[in-house]
Amino acid sequence: MVSSPPRPTALTDDIHAFGPARATIQGQPLSDSEVEAMDAFFRACNYLAVGMIYLLDNPLLKEPLKPEHIKKRLLGHWGSSPGLAFCYLHLNRIIKKYQQEVIFLAGPGHGAPGVLAPVYLEGSYSEIYPNISEDAAGLKKFFKQFSFPGGIGSHCTPETPGSIHEGGELGYVLSHACGAAFDNPDLIVAAVVGDGEAETAPLATSWHINKFLNPARDGAVLPILNLNGYKINNPTILARIPHQDLENYFRGLGYDPCFVEGSDRPSMHQAMAATLDYCVTRIKEIQRTAREEGLTTLPRWPMIVLRTPKGWTGPAEVNGHKVEGSWRAHQVPLADVHTNPENLQLLENWLRSYRPEELFDHNGTFRPDLKALAPTGNYRMGMNPHANGGLLRKDLKMPNFREYGITFDKPGQIEVENTRPLGVFLRDVMRNNPRNFRIFGPDETTSNKLNAVYEASKKFWIAESFDEDADGGELSPEGRVIEMLSEHTLEGMLEGYLLTGRHGFFSTYEAFVHVIDSMFNQHAKWLSICNELSWRADVSSLNLLITSTVWRQDHNGFTHQDPGFLDIVCNKSAKVTRIYLPPDVNSLLSVADHCLRSKNYVNVIVSDKQLHLQYLTMDQAIIHCTKGVGIWDWASNDQGYEPDLVMASAGDIPTQEALAAIALLRQEFPELKIRYINVVDLFKLQPETEHPHGLSDRDFDSLFTLDRPIIFNFHGYPWLIHRLAYRRHNHRNLHVRGYKEKGNINTPLELAINNEIDRFSLAIDAIDRLPELQVAGAHAKEKFRNMQIAARNYAYEYGVDKPEFSHWTWPF
């Protein structure tokens, strides 16, 4: 590991946030006038931050503050705002000094006033929102809209210029930053980590992003841990451990930690400027060495530990209680200003302490000499195109997916691992797009049968290597497959990669995709809002392959059996969510090609990796996937008739069992007219008024009939189908089978039997719902029950399914 050079230090064991600056890096790079100007910009940021939380009117305090000038409902988070603004304005200096591209991610996104303020002051906000002008009238609107109905949210939402990270749900800032830095060699991603955020599991793991950045081809992430000491009502852990332990912690993680601590503003400006000069210089040294001499060892990237008081520059005390430097600064330090004249005066004094009359002219325009501290054009962090990644996005150069399909003579006769041809297809997608496409997986790419991608690019690895790694390890410092056993970190990397204009693909085990439930939620919400913003350019969809599915987790057992992620996806906006359940290889390839070309969606593809029957030729698969739902004529015998029964399914295993049930019924009752319907696009079941992919009632009724019994065999939890189809005319005759939380170490057929998605249960269900078979079907039901019992007993004795069931083929 490359070590950092020895440096002088003025650090002590003091872990308090007050006093003159204490810093690892010594120096005074700023002149007195520069310190004064930097502090004036800082005062302006803090003034705006307080104004956003409190003010409805009187934005420049041209008259004494009155209750009617104050918002009726006070919302926002003051405590983190000064630290964020301090980082932002010092990064502006770095951008100008080094002509360096930087984007800014605020982990504690609830401190949005500290980000919105400098974005407004640099001019980016008014450029995107001309109605929020750079004068008193615009400032009044800017204050009013914050955390206000009809305005903007209280975090770094998609409406925030320069934001790719909302920071509402904490823990993802470093993984988002890493994704943004991938394949952006000239970019520094400044990622402010809140010390409360640092206690979350995703953040604690994501410190390891420094092992996944290649300085020869990637940009850099500069983590800035803001130790302001408190969460909502508790001290933070990292702010209360001994200084040496904290430094050792980050050194052990492979960083070069640079401390900047204190509250005295002039000395803090000097310390932060010197520290950022060191960090940028060090980053450039690491990158130059790797790009000129090759990457030989794991770099030790710099990071900053910024210890400042929570609510820095705010009221020291309120009503006899400490505020600045305590948890009371977290949200709204003065909450009763409408009714308490003393606190109203405190608020006015607080606002006037920033001396706004020195910062804005008589029209309310920010002083030009102070605005000049910020960069211009696209160097402004609010206008950097990397933070509006769709502006930089290029379509993938796609191979012809048809060339990766399989051929066969008859449907339902041969078995193929569904995901293996997909791996070959993805291999060539990666070959065609060596700088803007990556694959992510939590140690499962080979397990999920996608290992053909290693023919195009290995797994990225720059930590220590052993000789045995060469034997199938597939490791390389040039690799573009990212594997780490943290779904959180991988999902964050992918999101950051997509939001900065690139493309990606993530595969994971179905049961453990739940690890990123809430991350999916947040990303879907982000996309939903972006769709409403004309200035946000389209980004590539998040493509998620769910494999190692519930019905083939018979060997791992109950803990690995959970298809409920689909329920989570269905909770999100129909504008951004898509769910596909391709039943075989050719349909999976068609779906994958479609998803990789799409924009602004979360595409969830459910496909198992094991051997499965193949049903559709490539031409048939393309047509079927284009429609999303359809009758398989070769599996039906109702041609020219009203069907007696509709058998439907969604998912590979449910499809096999549904077809086997049809075969049982047709063998017992040759006159029975059965229509088989396969669903690839799950949202086809919803009405078109609820989802853009939904079928019209006319088309749904044409397929599923108005009054015939429907047996629907579903991959997931059965109630999801009822939820999607409850408005349909024939819902009363819809009977759904799916996973019912009945699992253990089973055989595949036994697991299906336990949850009643097996062929025997489906055939019995059909008989029970056909009045004409109530008498004639009794013997068949007994036969099917006997076969079911025999199948289970065989599994108990031999540990596998009977070959006639495990290698069943379509008999017609």
From Swiss-Prot:
Cofactor(s), names only, from the UniProt record: thiamine diphosphate
A GO MF term: aldehyde-lyase activity
GO biological process: carbohydrate metabolic process
InterPro entries to which the protein is assigned, alphabetical: Phosphoketolase (IPR023962), THDP-binding (IPR029061), Transketo_C/PFOR_II (IPR009014), Xul5P/Fru6P_PKetolase (IPR005593), Xul5P/Fru6P_PKetolase_C (IPR018969), Xul5P/Fru6P_PKetolase_CS (IPR019790), Xul5P/Fru6P_PKetolase_N (IPR018970), Xul5P/Fru6P_PKetolase_ThDP_BS (IPR019789)
Pfam families for this protein: XFP, XFP_C, XFP_N
Keywords from the UniProt entry: Lyase, Thiamine pyrophosphate
E.C. designation(s): 4.1.2.-
PROSITE patterns per record: PHOSPHOKETOLASE_1, PHOSPHOKETOLASE_2
Intrachain S-S bonds: none
UniProt-listed PANTHER family: PHOSPHOKETOLASE-RELATED
UniProt record similarity statement: Belongs to the XFP family.
Protein name: Probable phosphoketolase
Organism: Thermosynechococcus vestitus (strain NIES-2133 / IAM M-273 / BP-1)
